[in-house]
Amino acid sequence: MNISIISIGKLKEKYLKQGIAEYLKRLSAYAKVEVIELPDEKAPENLSEAEMLIVKEKEGIRILDKISDDTHVIALAIEGKQKSSEEFAVSLDRLATYGKSKVAFVIGGSLGLSSEVMKRSNESLSFSKMTLPHQLMRLVLLEQVYRAFRINRGEPYHK
């Protein structure tokens, strides 16, 4: 399985970079995983609704440019479906079973994802009803993907 994590914004925090590097190393035994960082759209504070839409649309274009037609896209969004780790593992396993060898997880910038990215997504996933920093979501997502592979192989880790 080829997994891409496409996210808006450059990661600056060293501790997050270290955690991400660790999970990428662990995941290399199970899948080809790449993290694609795309620049965020520079925007002043106190944007109007129309300006927010423009920012999301510009970031959305960058995201969509990185997704091929045969990729199964999972948008990370607060309004997405919440799953347990076991349910998430089953859904990843099903994708592999049904020949979906390319999977992209999409993480928007601080304003979220554009409507075009949401339309292109095959599903939407939420890790919590709480708002989490989009930089932190990369690490949380990689940990859950790793956990899913361990669960699916019956390997210890997930308890």
From Swiss-Prot:
Q: Which transformation does this protein catalyse, written as a reaction?
A: pseudouridine(1915) in 23S rRNA + S-adenosyl-L-methionine = N(3)-methylpseudouridine(1915) in 23S rRNA + S-adenosyl-L-homocysteine + H(+)
What's in the GO CC field? cytoplasm
The stretch of residues making up the signal peptide is: none
Its main subcellular localisation, reduced to a broad class, is cytoplasm
What domain of life is recorded for the organism?
Answer: Bacteria
Q: What does this protein do?
A: Specifically methylates the pseudouridine at position 1915 (m3Psi1915) in 23S rRNA.
Could you give the subunit structure recorded for this chain?
Homodimer.
Protein name per UniProt: Ribosomal RNA large subunit methyltransferase H
Recorded source organism is Bacillus anthracis
In the UniProt record, the gene name given for this protein reads rlmH
